[in-house]
Structures are given as C-alpha cells and as structure tokens.
Amino acid sequence: MKHAVMGWGMLAAALALAQEQNPAMSDAYWKLWNPEVQREIDRRIDQNRKADAALTLTGLPAGAEVKVEQISHAFIFGAHIFNFKQLGTAERNRKYEELYGTLFNSATIAFYWKKFELEPGKPRFEAEERDTAAYWDACKDPKNEIHWRRPAAEPAVAFCESKGIRLHGHPIIWGNRKWHHPEWLFETFCPADEKEKILKLGKEGLAKLTPAQIAELIPVYTREMKRLFEKRAVELAQRYQGRIHSWDVVNESATDFSRGLMVPGDAICKSHYGLMPGDYTWQAFQTVGPLFPKNVKLNINDYLNNEAYTRQVNDLRARGCRIDIMGTQMHLFNPQDCLKLADGQTISKPVNTPQQIWDTMDTLAKAGLPLHLSEITITSPNNDARGQQIQAVLTRNLYRTWFSVGPMMGITWWNVVDDCGAPGEPSVSGLFSRDMAPKPAFHAMNKLINDEWKTRLTLKAGADGKVAFRGFKGTYRVSWKDAAGAEKQAEFRLAKDGDGI
C-alpha cells in the first residue's frame, strides 16, 4: 500500500490544484472559502501544528548537507476498523488493512456491548469461526449477519499493534438501545415481579414517577444495572490495561445532562434512552478512573457541540472525574447537506464556514481539554462524478480547518468503505468504493496527511554543525555524512520549540 499511496501522488496533486476552484462547487461556495480564508487557515496550521527544531550534529562541517524526513505525525489521523476481515475477498481486505499505518495512525476498535457480549458473561474477545475472513468471504448477505461491523476485539487489537498504531476503544457505556445496550440486561436480570410492575405501568405511567419512586419500585434491577455496568468496565480495564491507548468511557450522554436528568445521588436516571443507572456518566468515570493506567486517556464523546456539553464536562471534572479528552462528532449523513454546502447554502451543522467551525471549537475548548473529532462522515451525493468531487473538496477544506484548531488532537473518519456503514448511515460516505477502489476524497486526504502535512527538507549545516528548521510536530529521521564520509542517522521527536538532537 505504501507504494500505492505514493503512486497515486500525481492524481492527488492534480486534484489539489483543481480544488482551488473546483467547478463541482459553486461560486457562492468559493466566496466563503476564498483565498483570504485559506491563508488564515494556513496561518493557524503553522501556529498550532508546527514547532521549531534545533539540531546540533557534532563534527559536521559548515555547509554539509543534512536530510530531514518526518516519519510520523504527533496528530492523530484515525478511522474505525469495524470492517476488519469482512470485505469479502482477500484483495479487498489487504487494501483495507494497508491503510492502517500508511494513511491512518489510529484505529477505533468496536466494543459495542450489545454485539460484543451477545450472551451475558460471554464477551467476544477472541475470534470464532464466524469472525474469520473465510466466513465473510463465503457470506452472501453480510449486512444481515448479527456481527456485521462488530469484529471480535482481540484480532483487531493485535493487528493494530502489529502496525504500531494507536488504538481507541469505543465505547464502554452508552444508553442507546439500538446499537449498544443489550436486551438481556432487562430480560435476564430484572426479576419477574419487577418486570410485571413496569409492564403494568406502561411507558406513560413510568414517565410520571420520580427516579426515587422507580428505584423503590424495582430495587433489584436498579442494583443489577449498576453492578453490570461496573462489571463491564472492570473486565475491559483488566483485559487491556495499557494496550488500548484511549477509551470513549461514555458516549452521547450530554442530552441527558442538558435535560437535567443527571442528578447526583439518584439511583435511577430517566434517560431519554430508557432507564439507566443514576448519574451514569459520573458513575462510569468514577469506576474506570482508578482501573486504567494514567497513560491511558479517558474520553467523553458526544454529538452535541454546544455550551451544554461544555457545562457537562466542567461539572463532571468539578466532581472529581478524570476526563482527559473531549470527543465531538460531525456526521454529514444527509447527502443533501453536502449538495447545499457545495451550492453555498447554509445547513444546520456548524461547518458552513471556517469561522463557524472555529467558534464551535472555541465553545468546546472552554472545558480546557484536548479535542478529538471522533466520528467524521462526509458523503458523496449520488456518488456520481460531481458528487465524488464535492466529497473531496469538502474533505480537504474541512480537514484543513479542523487541523488548524489549537486544542484539536485528532480527527477520525468513520466509514472508510462505501456501503459498509450501519443501517441508516449513507452508503456513499466512504473514501473507497465497495471494491476498494480509491475515490477522490481518499486522494484529497492522502495529499494532506502524507504530502502537505509532512516535513521533508534538505538543509545545509551552519557553524558548529547547527541545523534549524520549522516543521510539523511528530517523529523525524535525520541523515548526514560525518567528516570522514560515513553515513549517519538519528531520530528525534518534535513536540515543542527547541526539540531536536
């Protein structure tokens, strides 16, 4: 794949030039994303993503040639790896896997409770026959398999470790009944008499009760929910410790907080998802905080990107929760939104202009944490020639703007392959076709990550072997010849001004 990525460079370069005024986008769009705006994006990228390196290569005469090559990014460019071994042919799987370590330096591993633990007490850590490539290659209707997009955890983790990339676990706790919360929680652990009480009340009757009244009505299930939530967190922490570098501890709970449903001391939360343990976000962070090593980052993640989410994070931290990273999402699931953006029209998502993006991120940054754009979707409307160009232009301009945000630590693309999303997600939001043919959006992203945002320089040494340059933060390899003509190499990490050899 490395050769393929570089081999596509000419096409990627042509695409980047065309995007300066790509006719797929309207004049109204380009007025919003004009040269002055692009220069401001560049200025912020230089300010926030680069640092000044200072090298002293002892014994190197003045004027000697020094080659500087960035070999990895400090910034996280990720994608989920939910389709691991599931694409139907060895060639497709190979192309998919080769993206991790070339384009992506991070992978999000699926730990959705509902499919991770299909039966209580039987988490799917290890692969079974149904998790093998052979099983999926023979599968005629993969989307209807119960574990579609939910590979067993350990093979995906081991693969990412073999590539030397960062791993992100998603999620530990989430109230969503469709995607995460197992039915067996209620079916197996709510006693028959308590089930009968709930069914007799019905949804409307239950809604009239206070959390305290509900907890009194179903005391056993209230305790069992809390116990099983804690058990899940403990199992994941004990299994992976420091192998997985970060976790979405709680996913999409800010709506409950914004509605006043997260009440300290309550035994039950009347979540918009359904019944949850009381103050479940606080409880989750209190549980996992002592379990994971300090070098494992504990994230909160949400689709809300407003003051309510910032207030939630500040509240949790004020109450003693260790939260290291604040995750935010931007799913342009509706292809019409991408068409509207291309036509210069305004959509409800805060991505209409760079200034709107910066303002939104400034709101989240008030929590004082690094930001992770944890789930990104940009569709190619109709997936025709124009639609794919729209996707590519939006990808380039949005990634550039997000990359320019000071507190941003990473961006994670969601569905890498067309027609491989969850039911209800667009089938045309991939960087690749279903057959793993690269789309223009892939070339646009690859051009940024592996070309424009990687520093490669040939410099001349100054007096006393001193070499200075400004480059993107990350790991560098420096090559030179000493006074005797022997080849020399050294590596260093550029994280702040003054770093070097």
Language-model region placement:
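Hydrophobic h-region of N-terminal signal peptides that target proteins for export
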Residues: 9-18
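Beta-strand-rich domain onsets/edges
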Residues: 19-86, 106, 119, 125-126, ...
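Aromatic-rich peripheral "rim/lid" segments of glycoside hydrolase catalytic domains that contact
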Residues: 22-24, 29-30, 187, 191-194, ...
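Conserved, mostly hydrophobic/aromatic
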Residues: 55, 107, 160, 236, ...
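Hydrophobic faces of well-ordered beta-strands that scaffold small-molecule active sites
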Residues: 77-79, 104-109, 167-171, 245-249, ...
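Short Pro-Gly-centered beta-turn/loop motif in secreted/extracellular proteins
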Residues: 89-102, 467-477
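Aromatic-lined substrate-binding rim segments of carbohydrate-active enzymes
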Residues: 100-104, 111-216, 227-228, 233-239, ...
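Glycoside hydrolase catalytic-domain groove-lining segments
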Residues: 147-166, 262-263, 267-383, 400-408, ...
